């Protein structure tokens, strides 16, 4: 469950390390984002000479949450961290590699992230 001021890890090679959620997109007063939701983030930490600079405001999709994802069969998939993948304005990932596992719930809207990920749960 991601809300404003939540700090997330970045799960791609765009150059950002940590981002902070500044807005949950998709509704006028939407409070929480789950896996697969698009959020607006500010870059808090980035590696030098990368595609993304510290202070940049970007879009991101949530790929892992510590709260987890409840499946239709009743199973719950939880992760150790909250992580996101940075997107451009066309909702395509900026990075060319995805680190760590992602969930099947991204398949409908973000097939490119599924194909780049090493492990899909």
From Swiss-Prot:
Stored CDD domains: Ribosomal_uL14 (cd00337)
MF (Gene Ontology): large ribosomal subunit rRNA binding; structural constituent of ribosome
Listed transmembrane segments: none
Role: Binds to 23S rRNA. Forms part of two intersubunit bridges in the 70S ribosome.
PROSITE patterns named among the record's database cross-references: RIBOSOMAL_L14
Ranges in coiled-coil conformation: none
Protein name: Large ribosomal subunit protein uL14
Gene3D superfamilies listed in its UniProt record: Ribosomal protein L14
Quaternary state and interactors: Part of the 50S ribosomal subunit. Forms a cluster with proteins L3 and L19. In the 70S ribosome, L14 and L19 interact and together make contacts with the 16S rRNA in bridges B5 and B8.
Organism of origin: Legionella pneumophila (strain Corby)
Keywords: Ribonucleoprotein, Ribosomal protein, RNA-binding, rRNA-binding
A Pfam entry, by short name: Ribosomal_L14
InterPro entries reported for this sequence: Ribosomal_uL14, Ribosomal_uL14_bac-type, Ribosomal_uL14_CS, Ribosomal_uL14_sf
Cystine pairs: none
Record family assignment: Belongs to the universal ribosomal protein uL14 family.
Gene Ontology cellular component terms for the protein in this record: cytosolic large ribosomal subunit
Gene Ontology terms describing biological process: translation
